[in-house]
Amino acid sequence: MSKRTTYCGLVTEAFLGQEITLKGWVNNRRDLGGLIFVDLRDREGIVQVVFNPAFSEEALKIAETVRSEYVVEVQGTVTKRDPETVNPKIKTGQVEVQVTNIKVINKSETPPFSINEENVNVDENIRLKYRYLDLRRQELAQTFKMRHQITRSIRQYLDDEGFFDIETPVLTKSTPEGARDYLVPSRVHDGEFYALPQSPQLFKQLLMISGFDKYYQIVKCFRDEDLRADRQPEFTQVDIEMSFVDQEDVMQMGEEMLKKVVKEVKGVEINGAFPRMTYKEAMRRYGSDKPDTRFEMELIDVSQLGRDMDFKVFKDTVENDGEIKAIVAKGAAEQYTRKDMDALTEFVNIYGAKGLAWVKVVEDGLTGPIGRFFETENVETLLTLTGAEAGDLVMFVADKPNVVAQSLGALRVKLAKELGLIDETKLNFLWVTDWPLLEYDEDAKRYVAAHHPFTSPKEADIAKLGTAPEEAEANAYDIVLNGYELGGGSIRIHDGELQEKMFEVLGFTKEQAQEQFGFLLDAFKYGAPPHGGIALGLDRLVMLLTNRTNLRDTIAFPKTASATCLLTNAPSEVSDKQLEELSLRIRH
């Protein structure tokens, strides 16, 4: 077997006249009666190889037997294509290889679906079952090439900045961090369990107490939670922690790193600092803590209408401490029928809204179901507050503030997609800061950490932990990209007494706190430096930078929406002997 000269996708005019050896898969084969053309494929792309009896009759005979996905080795001379056969769509489109020798390395059965780019309309479950074939597609191959480039860029940046890459345990202790843990029974310790880490949070804090100063890890994390398009049970996190820093230091580091990544893998220079917005401002203007700022359509407070109008829904809402907000779809009045509006009403119902009121702005006033409730002065108020003009569609939700925010926040994104308002070429990064430290869980009747229990409150708000916990703000910051939460971080608590107070506010008894987190509280007794960090979702970053819409397309062997692996049929039953060794019994 000869040595490969180069990759198929890298054969360009620089190789003209050279005899080369290529190895790869038959992408397709065309028999033109006396001549056979084969597109040979590898991870870098496709090159056309030609079997011509003038060069080798023996090679032509073998080529007659090859089929799609055969693995072959070819030797031949690189020549320029005839002008009428040049393919400008591919990097190798100016050249072809006149084959003098071919060897079939391995045959292939007919694949369950075509690997050609033109034939990707295949049921996703079939693609996942034969994932090793799916990954041969150039589109996915390029996605994973970019994933490699992204991780390489991240590592280079962090290495240059003096960070140590340190691994943390995969088998660890189950602690209450929000999502359900994946549990691993211990054979040695009967009746006891390890947990797979939801994040290396506590270990990276312990590494700061150990004096390592700057840590990072590109690490697998596990959360047993309901899945959706941008979530997986196991995912990869870029985990970073730094000592003797404040919030500004961490945000600046994260920003510099992301700018470097985008420049190196996308060729896009991001000038200036990322925009910043407080949590309250994001919720007020966009109805979301991860707003997509690539388009306008902000939420506008029109609660004044509830005080001025004789419209019971609006009036009752304001009198019961609710609010009325509107969004304006510019020029969309004619695009949405009453049936369409009924569908949008059903959409906001999902988010708890009782209804969706709407009007269309025309030259002489308003039309629509509630248009008749608007007196002339009410119309003027609406147009002044919203800036709406003739041809615009104005939609209202009147309810509790959180319902208004969630429903209109989701609706603006839906409308933007339907109306084509989103510039898909934009990369709109945004920092969301000044988060609430705590949230109140109505079901559990207690406070829970908005991020995690180790986030420090703002110094000015520490006293509020004992008096008004719901008002305390955190030294926390999220990085958002195009409406997706890319990652989040915070300055951590580094004082044992404050950490114990935080556990108390969260409803832990001293005994429970010691049992769950005693190792951390003990570590705080031995000189903990101020520290903080951030964690970025690598899979999500790759998804956004490669313009994918599904997280599964960025993971080599992903799980389905029901957390199964169709390739290996995991999870699976295990033998009675294995269960017995673990002292486990399955109850159906």
Curated annotation (Swiss-Prot):
Chief site of localization: cytoplasm
**Annotated catalysed reactions:** tRNA(Asp) + L-aspartate + ATP = L-aspartyl-tRNA(Asp) + AMP + diphosphate
Its Enzyme Commission number(s) read 6.1.1.12
A GO cellular component entry from the record: cytoplasm
Q: What molecular functions are annotated in GO for this chain?
A: aspartate-tRNA ligase activity; ATP binding; catalytic activity, acting on a protein; nucleic acid binding; transferase activity
InterPro entries reported in the protein's UniProt record: Aa-tRNA-synt_II, aa-tRNA-synth_II, aa-tRNA-synth_II/BPL/LPL, Asp-tRNA-ligase_1, Asp-tRNA-ligase_1_N, Asp/Asn-tRNA-synth_IIb, AspRS_core, GAD-like_sf
Question: Binding residues for ATP, per the UniProt record?
Answer: R223, D224, E225, Q232, E485, G537, L538, D539, R540
Which keywords label this protein?
Answer: Aminoacyl-tRNA synthetase, ATP-binding, Cytoplasm, Ligase, Nucleotide-binding, Protein biosynthesis
Is Nucleotide-binding found in the keyword set?
Answer: yes
Question: Pfam families attached here?
Answer: GAD, tRNA-synt_2, tRNA_anti-codon
Q: State where the protein is found.
A: Cytoplasm
Single biological process term from Gene Ontology:
aspartyl-tRNA aminoacylation
Give the region (Aspartate) as residue ranges.
Answer: 201-204
The record's note on quaternary structure and interaction partners says: Homodimer.
Query: What's this chain's function?
Result: Catalyzes the attachment of L-aspartate to tRNA(Asp) in a two-step reaction: L-aspartate is first activated by ATP to form Asp-AMP and then transferred to the acceptor end of tRNA(Asp).
Belongs to which family?
Belongs to the class-II aminoacyl-tRNA synthetase family. Type 1 subfamily.
Q: What is this protein called?
A: Aspartate--tRNA ligase
- Please state the gene responsible for encoding this protein: aspS
